[in-house]
Amino acid sequence: MGEDGFVTPPRREETLGLLLGFLGVAIFAATLPLTRLAVGSLSPQFLTTGRAVIAGLLAIPVLAIGRRAPPWRDFPRLALAALCLVVGFPGFSGLAMRGLPAAHASVIIGALPLATAAAGALIDGDRPSPGFWICAVAGSALVVAFALHSGGGALQAEDALLLAAVASAAVGYTLSAQLSRRMPARDVISWIVLLALPVTAPLSFLWRPENAASVPGSAWACLAYLGAMSAYLGFFAWNAGLARGGVARVSQAQLAQPFLSLGLAAWLLGERIDAETGLCAVAVVSLVFVGRRFRAGSAGRQISGASPAQALPLRRT
């Protein structure tokens, strides 16, 4: 048994789990840069609903092949998770990305693991140590200070939207973690996006571009990636990695995400990463790392009878 309460996986399984975990992180790291690229041609509303429609359509054959019965007793929790993960996070971040560089946004979103752990304490009954809370408060203060400094002493509306996106994702991941103790994690994300489909499909039609032919192919490619990978299939690699390598070990892979996002922002968007942004990203990731160390004893908590494969990651979008 490992310190996180799970059976320690064989080294080969652990290595495979880490590789899958890094694959999931790499998939998610492109979310903000591609959103920034797409909102130049597609509205945030269409981008939010369109990616959800793509994910929902992909979920139909997955659930049909598995012959999964609708989890009616979990409908309220699934609906709230869908509100947070299908509408809240992509909607708020999409609106924010109209006026913020992807590099700037990557620093703020880098605090998501701490926010998710805090949501787990408030909603799911986790009891992190005082050291974790110190890191959480310090990380939050650092993110707010970075936003204030970048905004000339005032919090920009886009920064407030990003903070709302972080809060939405944190609550959504916590609710998903609760649901994952009752059903496989892939079914949780599948039901979440499928449940939202009757709402997102007509809204995406309503908010579609007036002249779709004038939208560049790069914007459509970004939408396809966000829907298929960021909103759906990315969770498959991430969840499989957690199941094989252990939650406490593989979850450390997400520490690389802000740096991958910064690199993609520079490569895809030509954004200049100044020393201030880079140093702040390092500081936020360091606080996340230390905070996770403090809460290692409770990070792998699970209900009796639930397997590691059913534990949803404390991570996105």
Where are these predicted regions, by residue range?
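Structural signature of hydrophobic alpha-helical transmembrane segments
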Residues: 40-55, 94-112, 156-168, 217-231
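Membrane-interface helix-cap regions at the ends of transmembrane helices
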Residues: 30, 34-37, 41, 55-72, ...
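Hydrophobic transmembrane alpha-helices of multi-pass small-molecule transport proteins
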Residues: 59, 79, 111, 119, ...
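Helix-helix packing/entry segments at the starts of transmembrane helices
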Residues: 48-50, 90, 104-111, 175-198, ...
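Glycine-/small-residue-enriched transmembrane alpha-helix faces in small-molecule transporters
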Residues: 1-49, 91, 95, 151-178, ...
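Transmembrane alpha-helices of multi-pass small-molecule transport proteins
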Residues: 2, 17, 41-88, 113-119, ...
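Specific transmembrane alpha-helical segments of multi-pass solute transporters/efflux pumps
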Residues: 26-32, 60-109, 145, 227-245
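C-terminal-most transmembrane helix of multi-pass membrane proteins
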Residues: 2-10, 19, 50-52, 148-149, ...
